[in-house]
Amino acid sequence: YREGMQYVHDQPIRLMNKGLTPDQIVEELDLPKNLKESPYLAEFYGTVRYSVRSIFNGYLGWFSGDLADLDPLNINEKSQRISDLAGGNENLFSELIRASDASEHQWVL
């Protein structure tokens, strides 16, 4: 158990020091096979992905390294532009229904 916790703490820091963003670290980091197979490290109440983001925020704060985070569009402006780009609200709603029917829950969100 201790080895797993140490790995999940140290590896994000190693990748942060290489300049990776939280999203990049989440995609790159995975437990080694010997830790993944441990019943004591099963992901019930949290995941390595959650932990990576928490560790990043704990050490470096809210800024992810993405310049778009410094002064983002407000949510209404961003939503309208995305809707326009997609061809309007009807197209977005159709995609929402399709994704929901396909159990693509993360995409629906």
Question: Where does each model-flagged region fall?
Answer:
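Accessory terminal helices/loops
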Residues: Y1-L109
